[in-house]
A protein has these predicted regions:
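SAM cofactor-binding core of SAM-dependent methyltransferases
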Residues: 1-28
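Short glycine-/small-residue-rich Rossmann-like dinucleotide-binding loops
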Residues: 46
Length: 197
Protein backbone atom coordinates (compact mmCIF):
# COMPACT_ATOMS: atom_id res chain seq x y z
CA UNK A 1 0.00 0.00 0.00
CA UNK A 2 1.37 3.41 -0.97
CA UNK A 3 0.26 7.03 -1.07
CA UNK A 4 1.20 10.09 -3.09
CA UNK A 5 0.99 13.16 -0.88
CA UNK A 6 3.12 16.27 -0.46
CA UNK A 7 1.44 18.04 2.48
CA UNK A 8 3.00 17.37 5.91
CA UNK A 9 -0.23 17.06 7.93
CA UNK A 10 -1.92 14.38 5.75
CA UNK A 11 1.36 12.45 5.66
CA UNK A 12 1.49 12.47 9.47
CA UNK A 13 -2.13 11.32 9.71
CA UNK A 14 -1.48 8.35 7.41
CA UNK A 15 1.71 7.48 9.31
CA UNK A 16 -0.35 7.31 12.51
CA UNK A 17 -3.35 5.46 11.05
CA UNK A 18 -1.52 3.26 8.51
CA UNK A 19 2.03 2.70 9.81
CA UNK A 20 2.95 0.39 6.91
CA UNK A 21 2.00 3.01 4.29
CA UNK A 22 4.79 3.83 1.85
CA UNK A 23 4.87 7.50 0.84
CA UNK A 24 6.05 7.84 -2.77
CA UNK A 25 5.95 11.63 -3.06
CA UNK A 26 4.61 14.11 -5.60
CA UNK A 27 2.24 12.51 -8.15
CA UNK A 28 3.54 14.79 -10.91
CA UNK A 29 7.02 13.29 -10.55
CA UNK A 30 6.03 9.60 -10.40
CA UNK A 31 6.36 7.00 -13.14
CA UNK A 32 3.53 4.47 -12.88
CA UNK A 33 5.69 1.73 -14.42
CA UNK A 34 8.04 1.97 -11.43
CA UNK A 35 5.38 1.81 -8.70
CA UNK A 36 4.45 -1.40 -6.87
CA UNK A 37 1.30 -2.86 -8.51
CA UNK A 38 -1.96 -2.38 -6.59
CA UNK A 39 -5.55 -3.45 -7.21
CA UNK A 40 -7.09 0.01 -6.85
CA UNK A 41 -5.97 3.61 -7.28
CA UNK A 42 -8.03 6.07 -5.20
CA UNK A 43 -7.83 9.81 -5.62
CA UNK A 44 -9.63 13.01 -4.99
CA UNK A 45 -8.05 15.89 -6.86
CA UNK A 46 -8.27 19.19 -4.96
CA UNK A 47 -11.78 20.53 -5.38
CA UNK A 48 -11.27 24.30 -5.39
CA UNK A 49 -11.27 24.57 -9.20
CA UNK A 50 -14.51 22.54 -9.54
CA UNK A 51 -16.42 23.85 -6.53
CA UNK A 52 -19.30 26.28 -7.03
CA UNK A 53 -17.72 28.28 -4.18
CA UNK A 54 -14.37 28.50 -6.00
CA UNK A 55 -13.02 30.31 -9.05
CA UNK A 56 -14.40 27.58 -11.38
CA UNK A 57 -11.13 27.13 -13.28
CA UNK A 58 -12.23 23.52 -13.86
CA UNK A 59 -9.91 20.72 -14.92
CA UNK A 60 -7.61 23.25 -16.54
CA UNK A 61 -6.98 24.73 -13.09
CA UNK A 62 -3.67 23.98 -11.37
CA UNK A 63 -5.27 22.03 -8.52
CA UNK A 64 -8.10 20.01 -10.06
CA UNK A 65 -5.87 19.23 -13.04
CA UNK A 66 -4.16 16.68 -10.76
CA UNK A 67 -6.96 14.34 -11.86
CA UNK A 68 -5.09 13.95 -15.16
CA UNK A 69 -2.01 12.81 -13.21
CA UNK A 70 -4.10 10.10 -11.53
CA UNK A 71 -5.27 8.88 -14.95
CA UNK A 72 -1.70 8.99 -16.30
CA UNK A 73 -0.46 6.81 -13.41
CA UNK A 74 -3.24 4.26 -13.95
CA UNK A 75 -2.38 4.04 -17.67
CA UNK A 76 1.36 3.67 -16.98
CA UNK A 77 0.77 1.00 -14.34
CA UNK A 78 -1.59 -1.01 -16.55
CA UNK A 79 0.76 -0.75 -19.56
CA UNK A 80 3.69 -1.95 -17.42
CA UNK A 81 1.63 -4.88 -16.12
CA UNK A 82 0.69 -5.87 -19.69
CA UNK A 83 4.36 -5.68 -20.72
CA UNK A 84 5.15 -8.08 -17.85
CA UNK A 85 2.79 -10.57 -19.52
CA UNK A 86 -0.37 -10.04 -17.50
CA UNK A 87 -3.66 -9.99 -19.42
CA UNK A 88 -7.39 -9.50 -18.92
CA UNK A 89 -8.58 -9.53 -15.30
CA UNK A 90 -4.99 -9.90 -14.05
CA UNK A 91 -3.86 -6.43 -15.27
CA UNK A 92 -3.52 -4.00 -12.37
CA UNK A 93 -4.85 -1.72 -11.18
CA UNK A 94 -8.23 -3.23 -11.94
CA UNK A 95 -10.14 -0.43 -10.23
CA UNK A 96 -9.97 3.34 -10.05
CA UNK A 97 -11.88 5.52 -7.60
CA UNK A 98 -12.26 9.29 -7.93
CA UNK A 99 -13.97 11.56 -5.39
CA UNK A 100 -14.88 15.20 -5.77
CA UNK A 101 -17.49 17.91 -5.19
CA UNK A 102 -20.86 17.97 -6.99
CA UNK A 103 -19.69 21.20 -8.64
CA UNK A 104 -17.91 18.92 -11.12
CA UNK A 105 -21.35 18.20 -12.63
CA UNK A 106 -21.66 21.87 -13.70
CA UNK A 107 -18.03 22.96 -14.19
CA UNK A 108 -16.74 23.79 -17.66
CA UNK A 109 -18.18 25.11 -20.91
CA UNK A 110 -20.69 23.96 -21.90
CA UNK A 111 -21.95 23.49 -18.35
CA UNK A 112 -20.83 20.05 -17.14
CA UNK A 113 -18.04 19.64 -19.71
CA UNK A 114 -15.44 18.93 -17.01
CA UNK A 115 -17.39 15.90 -15.75
CA UNK A 116 -17.74 14.66 -19.33
CA UNK A 117 -13.95 14.92 -19.68
CA UNK A 118 -13.45 13.01 -16.41
CA UNK A 119 -15.63 10.18 -17.73
CA UNK A 120 -13.95 10.20 -21.13
CA UNK A 121 -10.40 10.15 -19.73
CA UNK A 122 -11.20 7.18 -17.49
CA UNK A 123 -12.91 5.26 -20.33
CA UNK A 124 -9.84 5.94 -22.50
CA UNK A 125 -7.67 4.01 -20.03
CA UNK A 126 -9.45 0.93 -21.40
CA UNK A 127 -10.31 2.08 -24.94
CA UNK A 128 -7.94 4.77 -26.19
CA UNK A 129 -10.04 6.75 -28.65
CA UNK A 130 -13.64 6.61 -27.47
CA UNK A 131 -15.79 9.76 -27.24
CA UNK A 132 -18.14 10.09 -24.26
CA UNK A 133 -21.06 12.42 -25.03
CA UNK A 134 -22.44 14.83 -22.47
CA UNK A 135 -26.10 14.94 -21.42
CA UNK A 136 -26.59 18.36 -23.02
CA UNK A 137 -28.82 20.31 -22.84
CA UNK A 138 -29.78 18.52 -19.59
CA UNK A 139 -27.66 18.43 -16.42
CA UNK A 140 -25.70 15.39 -15.28
CA UNK A 141 -27.70 13.00 -13.12
CA UNK A 142 -26.52 12.38 -9.55
CA UNK A 143 -25.96 8.70 -10.39
CA UNK A 144 -25.15 6.90 -13.61
CA UNK A 145 -23.00 4.34 -15.36
CA UNK A 146 -21.14 3.59 -18.57
CA UNK A 147 -20.67 0.09 -19.98
CA UNK A 148 -18.10 -0.76 -22.64
CA UNK A 149 -18.46 -4.31 -23.89
CA UNK A 150 -18.43 -6.98 -21.18
CA UNK A 151 -15.15 -6.03 -19.55
CA UNK A 152 -15.47 -2.37 -18.51
CA UNK A 153 -17.87 -0.48 -16.30
CA UNK A 154 -17.86 2.93 -14.71
CA UNK A 155 -20.42 4.24 -12.23
CA UNK A 156 -20.84 7.44 -10.27
CA UNK A 157 -23.04 8.43 -7.37
CA UNK A 158 -23.42 11.57 -5.28
CA UNK A 159 -23.39 10.69 -1.57
CA UNK A 160 -23.89 12.85 1.52
CA UNK A 161 -21.38 12.31 4.35
CA UNK A 162 -24.06 12.82 7.03
CA UNK A 163 -25.38 9.35 6.19
CA UNK A 164 -21.94 7.76 6.56
CA UNK A 165 -21.02 8.74 10.11
CA UNK A 166 -19.78 12.31 9.56
CA UNK A 167 -21.42 15.03 11.65
CA UNK A 168 -21.98 17.42 8.75
CA UNK A 169 -23.75 17.66 5.42
CA UNK A 170 -21.10 17.25 2.77
CA UNK A 171 -22.08 15.90 -0.63
CA UNK A 172 -19.43 14.29 -2.81
CA UNK A 173 -19.34 12.49 -6.14
CA UNK A 174 -17.85 9.00 -5.93
CA UNK A 175 -16.86 7.42 -9.23
CA UNK A 176 -15.65 3.82 -9.61
CA UNK A 177 -14.21 2.27 -12.78
CA UNK A 178 -13.75 -1.49 -13.20
CA UNK A 179 -11.31 -2.07 -16.07
CA UNK A 180 -12.03 -5.81 -16.22
CA UNK A 181 -15.73 -6.32 -15.54
CA UNK A 182 -19.15 -4.93 -14.73
CA UNK A 183 -18.94 -4.46 -10.96
CA UNK A 184 -18.66 -0.64 -10.72
CA UNK A 185 -22.39 -0.01 -10.23
CA UNK A 186 -22.65 -2.86 -7.73
CA UNK A 187 -19.84 -1.33 -5.65
CA UNK A 188 -21.72 1.98 -5.43
CA UNK A 189 -25.22 0.43 -5.27
CA UNK A 190 -26.25 2.72 -8.11
CA UNK A 191 -29.72 3.04 -9.54
CA UNK A 192 -29.10 5.11 -12.62
CA UNK A 193 -29.48 6.15 -16.14
CA UNK A 194 -26.82 4.48 -18.26
CA UNK A 195 -24.89 4.92 -21.46
CA UNK A 196 -23.58 1.93 -23.39
CA UNK A 197 -20.62 2.74 -25.63
Amino acid sequence: MWASEIEAFPIEVTKQRFPSMIHVGDITKLNGAELPPVDIICGGSPCQDLSVAGARAGLSGARSGLFMEQVRLVKEMRNADEQRGRAGHAVRPRYMLWENVPGAFSSGTPKGEDFRIVLEEIVRVKCGSVYVPGPYPWPWQSAGRILLGTDFSLAWRCLDAQYWGVAQRRKRIFLVADFAGRTADKILSVSYTHLTL
